Amino acid sequence: MKLRIIVTLKNGVLDPQGKAIQHALGGLGFEGVEDVRAGKIFELELADSTSDAAVDEMCRKLLANTVIENYRVEKL
């Protein structure tokens, strides 16, 4: 099975990478960019027998810092 894990910063957590991208877009002449939030995407190919609990554990233990990040899992 193929999964996509999308990791984003929680609301209220400062995003310096997003702010740098927003500033760079403005410097390149792109107007109207009001906010940018950066995140990560992981695409995993796992055995069909892999449980949802195992995927959740992968996310919590390695792929996302659950103190400051949220994650969601999409089946591809």
In which residue ranges do the predicted regions lie?
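Long, contiguous binding/interaction regions
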Residues: K2-E43, A47-T50, A54-L76
